[in-house]
Amino acid sequence: GSICLEPKVVGPCTAYFPRFYFNSETGKCTPFIYGGCEGNGNNFETLRACRGICRA
């Protein structure tokens, strides 16, 4: 879906949530640290969820 094309958003908060996002340049789901607020849809709790939705 289109959420897979959204940019990675860490957000301004300083929590530490290991998440995955779909990197549209590489075509792969990639780990990143999410700050906990003001994110977007390209933010998955598991690699499997990211791959399932973005078909990586």
Curated annotation (Swiss-Prot):
Disulfide bonds: C4-C54, C13-C37, C29-C50
Keyword Aminoacyl-tRNA synthetase found: no
Compartment(s): Secreted; Nematocyst
Domain BPTI/Kunitz inhibitor: 4-54
Recorded GO CC terms: extracellular space; nematocyst
A GO molecular-function annotation: ion channel regulator activity
SUPFAM superfamilies with a match to the protein in the record: BPTI-like (SSF57362)
Pfam family, one: Kunitz_BPTI
UniProt-listed SMART domains: KU (SM00131)
CDD domains cross-referenced by the UniProt entry: Kunitz_SHPI (cd22618)
Residues carrying the site annotation Reactive bond for trypsin: T14, A15
Domain of life the protein comes from: Eukaryota
Keyword line: Disulfide bond, Ion channel impairing toxin, Nematocyst, Neurotoxin, Protease inhibitor, Secreted, Serine protease inhibitor, Toxin
Gene3D superfamilies, per the entry: Pancreatic trypsin inhibitor Kunitz domain
Record-linked InterPro entries: Kunitz_BPTI, Kunitz_BPTI_sf, Prtase_inh_Kunz-CS, TFPI/VKTCI-like
Other information: Negative results: intravenous dose (up to 1mg/kg) has no toxic effect and generates no behavioral disorders in mice. A synonymy between H.magnifica and R.crispa is controversial.
Biological function: This protease inhibitor shows two different activities, it inhibits both the capsaicin receptor TRPV1 and serine proteases. It partially blocks the capsaicin- and acid-induced response of TRPV1, a receptor of the pain pathway. It also weakly inhibits trypsin and chymotrypsin activity (Ki=0.5 uM and Ki=7 uM, respectively). In addition, it may also alter tachykinin levels by suppressing endogenous proteases. In vivo, it shows antinociceptive and analgesic activities. It significantly prolongs paw withdrawal latency and blocks heat-induced and chemical-induced acute pain.
Stated family: Belongs to the venom Kunitz-type family. Sea anemone type 2 potassium channel toxin subfamily.
Name of protein: TauPI-stichotoxin-Hcr2d
Annotated source species: Radianthus crispa (Leathery sea anemone)
